[in-house]
Amino acid sequence: YSDYVESAAVLREKLSGFKPDVLIILGSGLGSLGENVQNPIFIDYGEIPRMRTSTAIGHKGRFIAGLLGGKRVLLMQGRLHIYEGWSAEEVVFPVRLAKLIGIDKMIITNAAGGINRDFKVGELMLISDFIKFNCVNPLAGRNIDEFGPRFPDMSRVFDRDYMDLFRSVCADSRENVREGVYFYCMGPNYETPAEIRAMRTLGADAVGMSTVPECIAARHCGMRILGITLITNMAAGILDKPLSGEEVIEAGNAASKRFVSHVAEFLRRMPLD
């Protein structure tokens, strides 16, 4: 715990008195949200002790602090993935730092493959729940009691009030936002068609390689969470073509204007209490 406290002190110092209320983690191809932050403070991950840096395509590896939608935000332009070789604890390190500097709200986004055949590329999906079957867990090992209990409840990971608010934001723009279950795979390989069929049978609507470790850590320390998925491709076996990281980035870029607008408006309407 002392390592977290020490790193949080450095982050607080770099923020020069600025006190964010909301942590925003950006997914593949969605980093352009950072360009809309007012009075930005840029902090490279490498400036924070014990903080790892992102190596994934489309992830810059820095914090941006400032105003977005009238709220004080700390934005992660580039997230960490376990497939990059980081441990689960290293992946959630920034979430715990955010908690220690006083943040108790998180908007987490990702690019994912659509499993639900009704979904279309470019649509947004509110994450209502997740499925995680692999054994990688950021809470494994000795519990850090200062963050939360040994056995945290996961029956309501994603905040229903936040979901309703984001849905109303999209409705005002006449955009239909989907809702569904996110299946977490570690990656970096894409899933096989057989795996996708199994996931669909289990009730999953989208699949991706991020988000779940951070959400587990955030709920462990009592954060309220809004999870947003951008469907950037259809999962393996649905369309007769191979999957690539480039199409994920392209779909993210194509949807970025709508995405930025919706998140900014959500922040404008979001109560801070």
Residue ranges and their predicted role:
Residues A98-G102, R200, R219:
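Non-catalytic positions within long, well-ordered alpha-helices that form the structural scaffold/packing
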